[in-house]
Swiss-Prot record:
Gene3D superfamilies: Adenylosuccinate Synthetase, subunit A, domain 1, Adenylosuccinate Synthetase, subunit A, domain 2, Adenylosuccinate Synthetase, subunit A, domain 3. GO terms for cellular component: cytoplasm. This is Adenylosuccinate synthetase. CDD domains: AdSS. Homodimer. GTP binds at residues 11-17, 39-41, 299, 325-327, 407-409. Pathway: Purine metabolism; AMP biosynthesis via de novo pathway; AMP from IMP: step 1/2. It comes from Coccidioides posadasii (strain C735). The lineage of its organism: Eukaryota, Fungi, Dikarya, Ascomycota, Pezizomycotina. The keyword Nucleotide-binding applies. InterPro entries: Adenylosuccin_syn_GTP-bd, Adenylosuccin_syn_Lys_AS, Adenylosuccinate_synth_dom1, Adenylosuccinate_synth_dom2, Adenylosuccinate_synth_dom3, Adenylosuccinate_synthetase, P-loop_NTPase.
Amino acid sequence: MVTLVLGAQFGDEGKGKITDLLSQTADLCCRSAGGHNAGHTIIHDNITYDFHILPSGLISPKCVNLIGSGTVVHVPSFFKELKALEEKGLKDANKRVFISDRAHVCFDLHSVVDGLEEASLGGRKVGTTGKGIGPCYSDKASRTGVRIGEVLDEGIVERKLRNLEAGYRRRFGDLTYDLEEEIKRFKEYRTLLKPFVVDQFTLLRKYKDASILIEGANALMLDIDHGTYPYVTSSCTGLGGTIQSLCLNPTEIKSIVGVVKAYSTRVGSGPFPSEQINEIGEKLQVTGREFGVTTGRKRRCGWLDLVMCRYSTLINHYTALNLTKLDILDDFDEIKVAVAYRLNGKEVESFPADAEELEKVEVVYETLPGWKVNTMGATKWEDLPPNAQKYIEYIEKDLGVPVRWIGTGPARSHMIERL
């Protein structure tokens, strides 16, 4: 039995909390894509945990966790994050997390190159996290990268890393990067990593009849194939990428949970049709505390975009939705939702593939009444004011997918579940 949790917008939807909730009954929790560019926060027993590369199933004491073959792993960050969790009380975390030997290694070299590539784009920067994710996936695609399993062989790592550095030096000239220092560090990591490295196929076979939870990173609109290219991440963040990365049997997928924030946010560059560059956007940013967990950057804010969510639903085939941060809308007199795009006076029939075209669309909004009632901490559907219920029902009707979970605050308990 497999359950997927996938971001339906631009990331930062709040996937961590629903993953934490579902992991309480899961035997295995897996990350399928991305690296330490991802970031989410979970509050449990008044303790705040920040996750980047590690699966958030680690908070559940009986849940085993896997970082799958489609990911890229920055080894220093892996150990730093693991240590931080242990210092906050998760003492056995290092015994419940494993890394696929087919995952790729994200070196410090990749971070240096990431910055150089962004600088070369000038005014058309992608707005990456600067963590080296793109260059690492590029090396993977060009068949020059290093896999986690190869770290256990000192000779392979040194040879491949020297080749990578030489290639980038030919491209960029001088690099502010210490090759010998990174080679030295990986000699130490060879021993430290060994207990964590597994053949994921053997592990997944062991759990074939168990409850498996897949934790998506980033979101559909940042997918390398289906997102707002080129303003995307470098991995497949949707349903297809998840199946590929973890070799899932599609017929065993029980549910696909799409996580949708009650409004829209985006970090970095790229088209954002419903963005509000005004006092509404500022209010959403301040009230919603919209700052990136990984970079600390301010998130751009706007109204919920149902055109985008329909497109996301079409690709990821959600069976249920988790609507998050409903309480952030409590103080609005009226709430708008994007229901259509117009371009050159005509309604756009399908979601534009061209980012420049998407930047030019005129958004058609539906205006719904606000509720002006505090919903933070609500745990029952009946606790919500009528207009908040109508807002949720409007989303359900438009997308054709039931909203099963509603987030009403930052704590694990701040969640409404509708059966």
